[in-house]
Swiss-Prot record:
Biological source species: Thermoplasma volcanium (strain ATCC 51530 / DSM 4299 / JCM 9571 / NBRC 15438 / GSS1)
Gene this protein is translated from: pyrE
Amino-acid positions noted as binding orotate in the UniProt annotation, renumbered to this chain: T112, R140
UniProt: 5-phospho-alpha-D-ribose 1-diphosphate binding residues: R83, K84, R86, H88, E108, D109, V110, V111, T112, T113, G114, N115, S116
Protein name from the UniProt record: Orotate phosphoribosyltransferase
Function as written in the Swiss-Prot or TrEMBL entry: Catalyzes the transfer of a ribosyl phosphate group from 5-phosphoribose 1-diphosphate to orotate, leading to the formation of orotidine monophosphate (OMP).
Amino acid sequence: MLSEDLVKSGAIKFGDFILTSGKRSDYYVDIKEAATDPNLLSEIASEFSKMIHARKIAGMELGAVPLIVATSLNMGIPYVIVRKERSHGTLSLIVGRLNRGEEVDVIEDVVTTGNSVLKAINVLRENGVVVKDAYCVVDREEGGAKLLENNGIKLHPIVRISELKR
């Protein structure tokens, strides 16, 4: 089971951690580390492939990139990358092709507050695509699903942190 494999791999650690936000947490989730293991990455892509219905997927650099590439290969569908703000090159926030009106599902590694994934969704919507669903490996259950719901997005996690903390 993926949740057990994430814990065994060290992608989910229990202890005392200080998060980027400065908050303390009794667990830490590092899906970027998990995505460097080809077997675990394949397992994650397989789980996403069972859930996703759109014919194109997208994700925010950096954390979602290996996830969307692996899922794209698994499903045989194209993907786009949403970049963080740029001050050089083409300044484009999208890598890949989008068609106005097409439905795109968004993949994220970890959802906490939902702000990061919502930022990616808003960039996609500004480019004329329809986003109704977001998928994540782990939902930390700290308000992200509610924020997305308030913006017309349904969050589909593979694992909820409450399932791991039983």
